[in-house]
Amino acid sequence: MAKKLFIAEKPSVAQEFAKALKYQMSRRDGYLESEEAIVTWCVGHLVTMSYPEVYDIKYKKWSVDTLPFIPETFKYEVISSVKKQFDIVSSLLNRPDVDTIYVCTDSGREGEYIYRLVEQEANIHGKKRRRVWIDSQTEEEILRGVREAKDLSEYDNLANAAYLRAKEDYLMGINFSRALTLKYGNHVKNYLRRDRAVISVGRVMTCVLGMVVNREREIRSFVKTPFYRVTGAFGIPMGDGKEKPFEGEWRAVEGSAWNLSPLLYKENGFSEKKDAEALMEKLGAVLPSGAMSPGFSGAFLEKCEKKKEQKNPPLLYNLAELQNDCSRMFKISPDETLKIAQELYEKKLTTYPRTDARVLSSAVAKEIHKNIGGLRNFAPVSAYAVQILEENSYQKIAKTRYVNDKQITDHYAIIPTGQGFSALRSLSPASAKVYEVIARRFLSIFYPPTISQKVSLTVLVKSQQLPQGERFFASFKVLTQEGYLGVSRPSFFSSKKEEKEEKNGEEEEFSCDEAFLKVLQTMKKGEQLPLHSLSIKEGETSPPKRYNSGSLILTMENAGQFIEDEELRAQIKGSGIGTSATRAEILKKLVTIEYLALNKKTQTITPTLMGEMIYDVVSDSIRPLLNPALTASWEKGLTGVAEGTITSGEYMDKLDDFVRRRTNIVKQLHNQSILYQQFDAIAGFYQKKETAPVVKKAGTAKKRTEKKENAEG
């Protein structure tokens, strides 16, 4: 009897497939079997690319004479630690009674690569191969994936992109790391007084290092500029002799005596304090008490603008947005967030985590009531789920911005499945919090927008010296419809903290109650207002903020912001640095190899001395690796291969040329002498923070004993 073989990426996923398929299976060594089917698994990667010495023993020793290393045909081998499972899977794939293979590895580029390597090394022929592509591990989704499985050949372009990504990382890593280590490794090693220094380079990794170092250098070179704002303490009569105080800010708008003046710092302040004091004196203020003098003519309401504002629920989570929010709210790293998202996926609580999409597919939208219905069993959001179902507010979701098939490549956004609640008790506190924010973000799209009433006041202050008057501005806002805010506020935050998080990064405005709003709305143009005093508020410009782990992930996702050329920016739109599946791992590696430092309490990321030294080495030798535009264009090319718009041959030719040309350039360079000066220039910023020995000055650098240039560092 012919059998079906289901091959998953890991044992736990294989178990879920076995349960969903409902075959009476017996456990074997490395697989499960029934009369109708076999379910087996990989344990992640079973096959890897061979080291250079497998091609020829001469490549084992690092030497510039053997670079560039670009094999015509790439070699692969079974990973020794998992050889037993590979042999089991290989024998099953080749069993005579197996006629159809269902590929159930992760539904993405890397999952495709894992299986294709196994198939390649197992040397399979004459079998039907079907690809199971699913968005969650619920029973219904697994059965749908099996039922609708397509011929594996339809995923050949995706497999080609996966192979090319691996070849790219392999060739750039081996050639550039060896070339730079042989050329500059001793200089790095000697400067840091280490036993050895291997310079690790990668297409994405080095670019991310460059982003962090560039930001750090921007902060160092930033010169704070003081500025001085003038504010007025006004009042609004509330009746019964009571008054509501408010602060208005002066701005040099059109009509001001200081409009376009070179004395200004922007529109709302002065570069020097004396000029701010001059404004106050001319308006009738007596310094330093701030009391108004007889020269003051009055403050009059010139304009009262009323405006209704609404804010729609945010788009759903993709992995980058989830990692950013978890870094901000919980101070957990992107790598930890991905592990949690993967755990929630494997426990059937949420959908596939490694997604770039922030919307739903139209097909999912038709069945979305099932996901909502399941959340009635999740206490923190149960009432909201019930309300959505009772009011049928999900029925028109397909016509909103939250559903868009064109914005989905492999998977839709991360949402709750509405199932798997038996696993909730086993979740860690961090995992439970992440699940709750995913559930709340999902339910919020079925709620109306928040609506606020905003009132903007323009107050004209006149004096004998400034009869035309100077204008002060204030804004007030009151929330009139909560909309989605209630469901989006996590249960584990106080409302005060949540409000702070919600307003994070928004323009500051004065909030008010509805009684005050009603008074504001009745005020008329020309009405005189009390002005009790004027004052100067000193401020200073702020340097750029350091990246935190979440903001760095988002920046990697949106690499186009670094590109000034509009045409090029448009070309790589939608392609970031790395992918949703790899960004967290790249960041983790940079921290592990001590090129970057991650503060676990704040999630702030900074370069280390060694990381900044490596940046200088790369900048002096293979500078394009630091260019986000180039890195994003490589990723765009891989997307083109996956979509069938670029052939594997075209991409490989480009890769071959880049690696060959850049490696040969490094071999011809003789610029090592400038490195110590560059290292000395940055070392002072690290001596207090790092425990490395005090670094010698540039004048003594030449006295260091160096090994031969072509020795391994």
What is each of the regions a protein language model found here?
Residues A2-F6, R28, L93, D99, ...:
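Basic, low-complexity terminal or inter-domain segments flanking catalytic cores
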Residues Y191-S200, V212-A276, M329, P353:
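C-terminal helical "lid" subdomain and adjoining coupling/linker elements of P-loop NTPases
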Residues L260-L315, Q323:
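Metal- or metallocofactor-binding catalytic centers and their adjacent structured scaffolds
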Residues F74, P96, Q137-F234, K307:
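C-terminal or mid-to-C-terminal helical accessory/interaction module adjacent to the motor/catalytic core
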Residues V13-Q24, T40, V188, R194-A233, ...:
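NTP-handling and nucleic-acid-processing catalytic cores
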Residues M1-R178, P543:
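Intrinsically disordered, low-complexity regulatory segments
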Residues A2-K3, C104-S107, A197-V198, K306-L315, ...:
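Conserved short loop/turn motifs at secondary-structure junctions
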